[in-house]
Amino acid sequence: MPGRCQLYLAAPAAFPPDFAARLAAVLDAAPVACLRLPALPEAAEFLRFAQARDIAALLDGNAELAQRLGADGVHLTDGAEFAAARRLLGDQAIVGVHCGSSRHAAMLAADAGADYVAVDADLELVAWWAEVMVVPVVVELGDNIARAAEFAAAGADFVLAGAPIFNDPAGAPAAAAKLAAEIA
């Protein structure tokens, strides 16, 4: 039986001037388990912001910068970088790997010790993963945000949303709260 699915939030690739206020409003409106930030030096402010709220804060694709800024870990898009990231960040850091829609890549990442595997919005893959594997699976929703509840029901541990939340006409806080309620 699937467990409770949680919200994993992806920040925009560049921080707009009002991002601190927008992020605060989202984090106050919805239970966010993890925040992925672009690998930019300015991410330090938002790392601390999330960590002060007990939200894991990861950098996207740069383990060295993640270590330097004090991030909780790193999200990788290439499983070949996993071993180096783990050595650099240590066993206490979160190291997740995006695997697309490849079962094989996901199994390799899990076998290597990834803390989570992130997959594309592939319902069959998520259901299979939830049934046979123990490593948490993150579904990268992309524009499939309306299908989040389906992925949660299929066994996703986390759903990742970014632009559809921050660009929602109803406002990012309302969009995040709605998504969190749909997947709980």
Which residues fall in each region the model found?
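Generic structural marker for isolated residues within well-ordered, non-membrane alpha-helices
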Residues: 23, 82, 126
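Short, ordered loop/turn segments at secondary-structure junctions
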Residues: 62-63, 79, 121-122, 164
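Catalytic-face loop-and-helix region of soluble metabolic enzyme cores
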Residues: 127-143
